[in-house]
Amino acid sequence: MKLKNFIPVIILLVNSLVLVAQEPARIPGEISIAFKAGNAAELTKYMNSTVELLLLDKSDFYKKNVAETVLKNFFVNYPAKDFIIRHQGAKNDAQYAIGILKTEKGDFRVYLLLKKVGQELLIHLVRIETENGN
Protein backbone atom coordinates (compact mmCIF):
# COMPACT_ATOMS: atom_id res chain seq x y z
CA MET A 1 0.00 0.00 0.00
CA LYS A 2 1.22 3.48 -0.76
CA LEU A 3 2.25 5.95 1.92
CA LYS A 4 -0.06 8.65 0.56
CA ASN A 5 -3.05 6.47 1.49
CA PHE A 6 -1.97 6.59 5.14
CA ILE A 7 -1.46 10.36 5.32
CA PRO A 8 -5.18 11.21 5.82
CA VAL A 9 -5.43 8.54 8.53
CA ILE A 10 -2.36 9.92 10.33
CA ILE A 11 -3.72 13.49 10.15
CA LEU A 12 -7.06 12.32 11.55
CA LEU A 13 -5.36 10.51 14.44
CA VAL A 14 -3.18 13.50 15.33
CA ASN A 15 -6.19 15.86 15.28
CA SER A 16 -8.14 13.47 17.51
CA LEU A 17 -5.31 13.36 20.05
CA VAL A 18 -5.09 17.15 20.13
CA LEU A 19 -8.83 17.46 20.78
CA VAL A 20 -8.72 14.89 23.57
CA ALA A 21 -5.77 16.65 25.22
CA GLN A 22 -7.58 20.00 25.43
CA GLU A 23 -9.74 20.36 28.51
CA PRO A 24 -12.81 22.55 28.24
CA ALA A 25 -12.80 25.70 30.34
CA ARG A 26 -14.50 25.09 33.67
CA ILE A 27 -15.28 27.47 36.48
CA PRO A 28 -14.41 25.80 39.82
CA GLY A 29 -17.42 23.90 41.14
CA GLU A 30 -17.03 25.49 44.56
CA ILE A 31 -18.02 28.85 43.05
CA SER A 32 -21.29 27.39 41.75
CA ILE A 33 -21.95 25.76 45.10
CA ALA A 34 -21.32 29.06 46.91
CA PHE A 35 -23.76 30.91 44.64
CA LYS A 36 -26.36 28.17 45.08
CA ALA A 37 -26.03 28.49 48.87
CA GLY A 38 -25.86 32.29 48.82
CA ASN A 39 -22.54 32.01 50.66
CA ALA A 40 -20.62 35.28 50.20
CA ALA A 41 -17.80 34.18 52.53
CA GLU A 42 -17.12 31.12 50.38
CA LEU A 43 -17.20 33.20 47.18
CA THR A 44 -14.64 35.55 48.70
CA LYS A 45 -12.13 32.68 48.86
CA TYR A 46 -12.04 32.72 45.05
CA MET A 47 -11.79 36.50 44.60
CA ASN A 48 -8.87 38.64 43.56
CA SER A 49 -7.72 41.20 46.16
CA THR A 50 -9.83 43.77 44.27
CA VAL A 51 -13.00 42.78 42.45
CA GLU A 52 -15.49 44.66 40.28
CA LEU A 53 -19.08 44.15 41.41
CA LEU A 54 -22.04 45.21 39.32
CA LEU A 55 -25.09 44.33 41.43
CA LEU A 56 -28.37 45.70 40.16
CA ASP A 57 -27.97 49.43 40.93
CA LYS A 58 -24.47 49.25 42.49
CA SER A 59 -21.30 49.26 40.43
CA ASP A 60 -17.80 49.71 41.82
CA PHE A 61 -14.42 48.15 42.49
CA TYR A 62 -14.17 46.72 45.99
CA LYS A 63 -11.49 45.23 48.17
CA LYS A 64 -12.14 41.57 48.83
CA ASN A 65 -13.50 42.07 52.39
CA VAL A 66 -15.87 44.87 51.31
CA ALA A 67 -17.04 42.79 48.32
CA GLU A 68 -17.97 40.04 50.77
CA THR A 69 -20.18 42.46 52.73
CA VAL A 70 -21.85 43.75 49.56
CA LEU A 71 -22.59 40.20 48.40
CA LYS A 72 -23.84 39.20 51.88
CA ASN A 73 -26.31 42.08 51.76
CA PHE A 74 -27.43 41.00 48.30
CA PHE A 75 -28.04 37.42 49.50
CA VAL A 76 -29.93 38.70 52.57
CA ASN A 77 -32.28 40.64 50.28
CA TYR A 78 -32.42 37.89 47.65
CA PRO A 79 -32.03 34.48 49.34
CA ALA A 80 -30.56 31.99 46.87
CA LYS A 81 -32.45 28.85 45.89
CA ASP A 82 -30.36 27.55 42.98
CA PHE A 83 -27.56 28.44 40.59
CA ILE A 84 -27.05 26.96 37.15
CA ILE A 85 -24.17 27.74 34.78
CA ARG A 86 -25.58 28.16 31.28
CA HIS A 87 -22.38 28.90 29.38
CA GLN A 88 -18.68 29.06 30.09
CA GLY A 89 -15.51 29.47 28.13
CA ALA A 90 -11.97 30.76 28.11
CA LYS A 91 -9.68 33.09 26.25
CA ASN A 92 -5.97 33.37 27.01
CA ASP A 93 -5.58 33.31 30.81
CA ALA A 94 -9.19 34.32 31.52
CA GLN A 95 -12.30 32.23 32.01
CA TYR A 96 -15.89 33.37 32.06
CA ALA A 97 -19.26 31.97 32.95
CA ILE A 98 -22.86 33.03 32.53
CA GLY A 99 -25.33 31.53 34.94
CA ILE A 100 -28.82 31.90 36.34
CA LEU A 101 -29.22 32.58 40.05
CA LYS A 102 -32.68 31.61 41.25
CA THR A 103 -33.75 33.44 44.40
CA GLU A 104 -36.90 33.69 46.48
CA LYS A 105 -37.60 37.05 44.79
CA GLY A 106 -36.85 36.13 41.18
CA ASP A 107 -34.14 35.06 38.80
CA PHE A 108 -30.91 36.88 38.01
CA ARG A 109 -28.33 36.53 35.28
CA VAL A 110 -24.80 36.24 36.66
CA TYR A 111 -21.64 36.98 34.69
CA LEU A 112 -18.30 35.92 36.15
CA LEU A 113 -14.83 36.76 34.88
CA LEU A 114 -11.88 34.89 36.35
CA LYS A 115 -8.23 35.51 35.55
CA LYS A 116 -5.07 33.68 36.45
CA VAL A 117 -3.04 35.32 39.18
CA GLY A 118 0.10 33.26 39.60
CA GLN A 119 -1.21 29.70 39.55
CA GLU A 120 -4.67 30.57 40.89
CA LEU A 121 -7.81 31.34 38.94
CA LEU A 122 -9.49 34.26 40.76
CA ILE A 123 -12.75 36.16 40.31
CA HIS A 124 -12.15 39.66 38.96
CA LEU A 125 -15.73 40.59 38.04
CA VAL A 126 -19.19 39.61 39.25
CA ARG A 127 -22.18 41.07 37.48
CA ILE A 128 -25.69 40.28 38.69
CA GLU A 129 -28.65 41.67 36.79
CA THR A 130 -32.32 40.85 36.50
CA GLU A 131 -32.98 37.93 34.18
CA ASN A 132 -34.56 40.14 31.51
CA GLY A 133 -31.41 42.31 31.44
CA ASN A 134 -32.92 45.44 33.03
Give the residues covered by each predicted segment.
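Bacterial Sec-dependent N-terminal signal peptides
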Residues: M1-A25
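Short, aromatic-enriched amphipathic alpha-helices that serve as compact interaction elements
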Residues: E23-N39
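Short solvent-exposed beta->alpha transition segments
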Residues: R26, M47-I84
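Solenoid-repeat scaffolds in large eukaryotic assemblies
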Residues: E42-T44
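A mature extracytoplasmic/lumenal domain signature
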Residues: M47-T50, D57-S59, H87-G89, I100-T103, ...
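Hydrophobic residues embedded in beta-strands of well-ordered beta-sheets
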Residues: V51, D93-Q95, L121
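Surface-exposed, charged secondary-structure patches
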Residues: T69-D107
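Short beta-strand edge/turn micro-motifs at domain boundaries
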Residues: D107-N134
